[in-house]
Amino acid sequence: MPNSSSTGTLPLTRILLFAGILLLGSLAWFVREAIGVRGQACFGILFFLGLAAACSDNLSNVNWRTIATGLGLQFLLGLLILKVDVVYSGFEVMGAIVSKFLEFANVGSEFVFGPLANHVKSEGAFGAGNGFIFAVRALPTVIFVSAVFAMMYHLRILQAIVWFFAKAMLLVFGSKGVSGAETLAATANVFMGQTEAPLIIKPYVATMTRSELLALMIGGMATVSGGIMAVFIGMGADPVAILATSVMAAPCGLYLSKLLIPETMEPVTRGEIKVADERAHTNVVDAAAGGASDGMMLVLNIIAMLIAFIAGIALINHLLMLSGQGINYLIAKVGFAFQFPVLSLEWIFSKLFSPIAFLMGVDSEDAPRIGELLGKKLVLNEFVAFTDLTDLNTTRENDKFVGVKGIQERSYRLAIYALTGFANISSIGIQLGGIGAMAPSRRSDLANLGMRALLGGFLATLINASIAGILMD
């Protein structure tokens, strides 16, 4: 039952916490030469957790053991993946499997699109560096992976995998820390999208507490679906980094939800792990066809968003340029000697988010460029940001991306950790429509939790990047 003795986090406490994290971030900047990039990342974890605490619904009700357990598990997963050779090799094998999936998808793409889907033939026609056509090389992977996942779901293979890892995570957290439903959803989000994963717990969504709903939403925003993972890998992202950040996000989303909105009620699924068995298809063939259709709708959605958002960026940049020219004209008329800087959306994002990139452990020289990508990811979407990130990784050998230009390799890899997630403004509407359809009675709660979920999902990817920044060579 709710704790009636608590009235929420006091305004003075919030002010002190905000002041504290600003001082912490400033200190990290001034001592950057002494602490190095790993030290920056350590400060970053404290900064991001402090920001979550400052935005907490009620700090007095936070179960700090749950927070410590989740952070410890997240760090342990990062340590195992990045520092233990056997585990790292295992993730490399999984990355190779995903890459093989890309090859299978390319076979289908070449049948439909012909030479356009063949990198070598496309370069011969369009010139060196122009062989990778995003719409016919990367996006068809979504259709194929969606079909495979639909078959795995129909055969209950995906549910079994999710159940196993959810059970393990619940044992680590303890039944008092998190509920079965939110743990299942957090695990499902590693493999599935933010509107597909909740299907695993569909019967329980209507009765979830506010804290559980927030965990469900954060889990969706802190990760990407299997199909999108494959697309990012096809665009040149390191498979190990993509897989690692998705796995690390599962415990992170859970403990951040308990920090932002502490659990004060008794969840219906306390200590229980039960997967909903709802199958929409009659057989495997029907599942494959349905999955392919769903994947096609996602591909069309991605194409539409990229066209709209990238065109929108060009429009906004043009308006900002005209505004800057007008201001400089007025300044010159008045007789002042200085000139107003040429504004662009990229310039604004780089200034606003470069401190965040710095606190992830990114080198200070690269922070403005990575900060620009973080801003695009949060305000626009992850595809726009990843498309720009790909521009920094355009050298290809044997149809594979190699090398990075313009920034350090370390900064590039940390950006992958931070950008792999659905945490952007449009995801609030996507979740409101998708999860709200499963439990119409909770639509108002979902709407009220939207901005907190966005914050939690964004912080989860930043903390993932910071942990990688500590562990990465």
Which residues make up each language-model segment?
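Structural signature of hydrophobic alpha-helical transmembrane segments
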Residues: 34-46, 137, 343-344, 416-424
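Short, membrane-interfacial amphipathic segments enriched in basic
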Residues: 44, 87, 156-158, 274-290, ...
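Interfacial/capping segments of alpha-helical transmembrane domains
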Residues: 35-41, 67, 71, 75, ...
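Hydrophobic alpha-helical hairpins/lids featuring a short glycine-rich hinge
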Residues: 94-95, 99-170
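Transmembrane helical segments that form the transport core of multi-pass membrane transport proteins
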Residues: 293-402
